[in-house]
């Protein structure tokens, strides 16, 4: 069986959308290829472990440069890795730098999770030089939606090598319930593009309760904003939540809010978790795959990015109409079962592996 090495930032139980996607892809590939993971550790220690049958090497970090975790041992680990295919999950500056240093021999595919949203000069001076060695060599570029395939400027020179493989979820393990006290849920990293400040301003002057899950550099600022807006006990910041707690919150919430303000939100994996739980979504019209996942007036509502008034109106509409929430939630569940199952993900991965010569044409999915 051929071996595929996935290079991520971190790996579960570390939280994050990319982390969940890498894990899901590895699990969906079981029996097709042997999946291994090279990622960074949240501490200074380098460890190897096995999670759900997947061998994971976590390289210790010594701090960060800006928002980039620094793992000095990463290039050496990449040089020593044995694989028939490397899948580099992007954006991932330290992994790109390591790739540029090592120039590993196995074929390469880039899983393009989202655009790098930076000022043009900053991108040209700092990001593009370390990205070029990998991008020029990659045999395939994988994106999660047709919208991202169309709009990703970094992939424009390589359109013939782009493949759309939407993310998948095990819908059988997600079931929604009607909680005794309806609330809006946000779950994600506390970084600027997530737009939690817009959500907080949307909640001002309403009686809507919200639970905000996650952590990151903006958390302190957003907690202070909630206090300034007088939201008090109306809004609860939980910090990072274990999987079991996040699942319980998702399954008992009334609405998922995804108030992202830039195309750095390329898909919004948390939307799949909401739809699998039969929960409606309020998302924004960022030019990415977010609005391809959540269908306006079908599985939820879509509002202009950065517009607190429109977000407030959408949340009030759904929170005030249990029947509409139920209808949107049921439509979301159907959409997951039709488009975003692990079986569909596995079929698409098998086709990719066949194209790259890792799987025989007759091999079953």
Please place each PLM-identified region on the residue numbering.
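Conserved acidic donor-binding segment of nucleotide-sugar-dependent glycosyltransferases
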Residues: 295-297, 301-309, 316-323
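N-terminal strand-loop element at the rim of the active site
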Residues: 8-15, 21-66
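An aromatic- and histidine-rich active-site surface loop
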Residues: 73, 85-105, 110-112
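Nucleotide-activated donor-binding/catalytic signature segment of Leloir-type glycosyltransferases, i.e.
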Residues: 223-241
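Donor nucleotide-sugar binding/catalytic pocket of nucleotide-sugar-dependent glycosyltransferases
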Residues: 57, 131-174, 238
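Short hydrophobic beta-strand element within catalytic cores of glycosyltransferases
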Residues: 280-284, 294
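Conserved donor-binding/catalytic core segment of Leloir-type glycosyltransferases
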Residues: 5, 175-207, 211
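Acidic donor-binding loop of glycosyltransferase active sites
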Residues: 139, 251-266, 279
């Amino acid at each position: 069986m051929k071996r595929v090495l996935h290079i991520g930032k971190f790996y579960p139980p570390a939280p994050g959308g990319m982390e969940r996607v890498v894990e899901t892809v590895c699990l969906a590939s079981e029996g097709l290829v042997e999946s291994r993971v090279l990622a960074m550790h949240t501490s200074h220690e380098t460890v190897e472990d096995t999670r759900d049958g997947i061998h994971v090497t976590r390289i210790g970090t010594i701090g960060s440069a800006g928002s980039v975790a620094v793992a000095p041992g990463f290039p050496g680990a990449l040089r020593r890795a044995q694989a028939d295919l490397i899948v580099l999950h992007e954006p991932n500056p330290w992994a790109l730098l390591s790739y540029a240093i090592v120039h590993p021999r196995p074929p390469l595919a880039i899983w393009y999770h989202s655009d790098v949203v930076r000022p043009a000069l900053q991108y040209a001076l700092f990001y593009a030089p370390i990205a070029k060695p990998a991008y020029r060599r990659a045999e395939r570029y994988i994106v999660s939606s047709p919208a991202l395939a169309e709009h990703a400027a970094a992939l424009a020179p390589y359109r013939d090598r782009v493949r759309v493989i939407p993310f998948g979820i095990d819908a059988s393990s997600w079931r929604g319930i009607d909680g005794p006290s309806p609330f809006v849920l946000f779950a994600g990293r506390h970084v600027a593009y997530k737009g939690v400040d817009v959500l907080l301003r949307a909640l001002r002057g309403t009686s809507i309760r919200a639970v905000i899950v996650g952590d990151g550099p903006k958390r302190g600022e957003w907690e202070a904003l909630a206090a300034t807006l007088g939201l008090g006990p109306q809004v609860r910041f939980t910090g990072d939540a274990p999987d079991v707690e996040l699942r319980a919150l998702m399954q008992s919430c009334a609405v998922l809010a995804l108030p992202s303000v830039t195309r750095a939100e390329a898909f919004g994996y948390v939307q799949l978790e909401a739809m699998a739980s039969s929960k409606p979504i309020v998302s924004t019209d960022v030019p990415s795959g977010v609005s391809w996942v959540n269908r306006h007036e079908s599985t939820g509502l879509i509002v202009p990015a950065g517009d607190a008034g429109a977000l407030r109106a959408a949340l009030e509409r759904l929170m005030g109409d249990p029947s509409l929430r139920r209808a949107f939630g049921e439509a979301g569940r159907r959409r997951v079962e039709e488009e975003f199952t692990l079986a569909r993900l596995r079929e698409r991965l098998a086709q990719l592996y066949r194209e790259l010569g890792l799987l025989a044409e007759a091999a079953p999915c």
